[in-house]
Amino acid sequence: MEKNLTTGSVFKNVVLFSLPYLLSYFLQTLYGMADLFIIGRFEGVASTTAVSIGSQVMHMLTVMIVGLSMGTTVSVGQAVGAGERKQAAHNIGNTVILFLVVSIALTAILLSLVHPIVVAISTPADAVSGTVTYLTICFIGIPFITSYNIISSIFRGLGDSKSPMCFIATACAANIALDYLFMGVLHLGPAGAALGTTLSQAISVVVSLTVILKRRSIVLKKSDFKLCRAVMGKILGIGIPIAFQDGLIQVAFIIITIIANQRGLNDAAAVGIVEKVISFLFLVPSSMLSTVSALGAQNIGAGKPERAIQTLRYAVMLAAGFGVLASIAIQFTAEGIVSLFTDPSTADGAAVVRFGGQYLRGYIFDCIFAGIHFSFSGFFCACRKSGLSFLHNIFAIVLMRVPGVYVTSKLFPATLLPMGLATAAGSLLSVVICLIAFGVIRRKSTLVLVEE
């Protein structure tokens, strides 16, 4: 389970570590897209909109949990890189206690806020009932979502990106089968989509716990579960800025969804579908962020900052290169991709395809810029300077992404293309800020050398 990533070819380590990560993200996105694809075949636009809006809320919650767990990945990775196995075990034990409390609190709070949340995001009237049902069931499953993500973060901190891939593969297969059962056979609509998602996560957690019991690379003692202020400080010091950053990014996209919702049901469905497609295309940037965090943390822990910088360079090259290719391809295939998620033979479906194609053609350029600033964010996390990642994203959201989308929505009511371009412009601003921050860090020679 544990793997040393501080020796050998940096490029090879990046590729070999990121591929399972990439496949994990692919599978996770696939089962999220499966909900929309399957419900689009068996239900109408209202149900599709309910699932797309509800899944955006759940995606926001999930990425915040993943962001918080980044503190575990980096803390465990630095301990492993430094050869401190006892410290790694202590970090893991404190993580378990922390996220146990977080999952219970989130479940209780969000279940009491289902209706206010649905109202706050301006859900179209026809989709309100389905969205409430979807979110209620998914909120009940928060402990499973939390458990899966902290287990995966621990494995990745230990240098193992393959096991989490197997866990999510199990969840993906279960979700697709359950979706067809609940929506195709039993016709449960949004409730069926939520049940499939929740139960598949539970199955994945059972599988991951079974693997942990069989492997004993890191042995946990009772004392490891005793809360330690220093350990919690490290985990939360890295995780909280990333969690808030990811949460605010999702808030920005929910605001964009609200803006789209106010334009009508077809625009709302189009934006919801494109968000799912973009989440699929963002697999490479996302995997590079996590790869740079994990590899960078181990190398910084081992006192090899130059290898962390090399990791960043290769990640930027791979992610930005992918973004360029994806941007070119989407210009020729946008409507065809959107049509997979709705019935273009109906009047509403044809409108969704048209609007979705417009939005996707503009939005896709975000793949290039996100590939760059995601990689830098991973590097900043590895250096335990996750506050920089938080700041560049906040500036991009407040100064460019949300204002840009709002203005273009008002100026161009007949098309979604300018809204897509405005979203990409936010990431371009992030890239500029990241380059400036990285230059300052290099000049001041403060890379790494994080306090013990």
Where are the model-predicted features located?
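Short alpha-helical transmembrane segments in multi-pass integral membrane proteins
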Residues: 1-18, 76-141, 185-240, 296-365, ...
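Helix-terminus/linker motif at the lipid-water interface of multi-pass membrane proteins
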Residues: 30-49, 118-125, 181-188, 247-280, ...
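Transmembrane helical elements of multi-pass membrane transporters/channels
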Residues: 16-32, 137, 171, 200-204, ...
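Signature of the first transmembrane helix
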Residues: 12-73, 77, 240-260
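Short runs within selected transmembrane alpha-helices of multi-pass transporters and secretion channels
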Residues: 69, 137-156, 164-172, 193-206, ...
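Small-residue hotspots at the loop-to-helix junctions and early N-terminal turns
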Residues: 43-56, 131, 135, 194, ...
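Small-residue-rich hydrophobic transmembrane alpha-helices
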Residues: 48-108, 145-164, 271-334, 370-389
